[in-house]
Amino acid sequence: MRSSTILFVLGVAMVAVNGVTTALISDGTGKGTQGKHRLLRSNSGKHKTDEERLKLSARIYGTKAYKKRQVRNRESARKFQKALLNMADGNDIARLLKKRNTTLKGLFALLARNKAGLPKEAKNHITTVYNTRRGGVL
């Protein structure tokens, strides 16, 4: 064999070994257990499309922050419900509000359906609260 052929074969072998080593390291097989877990965690948050992002929900329902938000929402719904009961004396909405113990979202849905029976200042109050809390228009 010629020396140029030997050098060429050695060069190809070195490139192949280098490629295999790089592939093993990037797959995590050459790393320890901690490195593999870190690699898995770093790749688990990457989603290619919006559909994949929607399938994996980002909410963690067991956290303290989520529970605090739920309690605050229930408390504000109760306060809002009491304020509406004081405004609406003896009409159909007052009876509906007394029957239900709803969340803030359910309360807004109820009011959106039955807003016609309230006095004018109550309608304005509902609209301003809805716009500031939800960013929408009734």
From Swiss-Prot:
Glycans are attached at residue 101. It is found in: Secreted; Host nucleus. Residues 1-19 form the signal peptide. A motif (RxLR-dEER) lies at residues 38-53. Keywords: Glycoprotein, Host nucleus, Secreted, Signal, Virulence. One of its GO terms (cellular component) is host cell nucleus. Secreted effector that completely suppresses the host cell death induced by cell death-inducing proteins. The RxLR-dEER motif acts to carry the protein into the host cell cytoplasm through binding to cell surface phosphatidylinositol-3-phosphate. This is Secreted RxLR effector protein 51. It comes from Plasmopara viticola (Downy mildew of grapevine). The lineage of its organism: Eukaryota, Sar, Stramenopiles, Oomycota, Peronosporales. The gene is RXLR51.
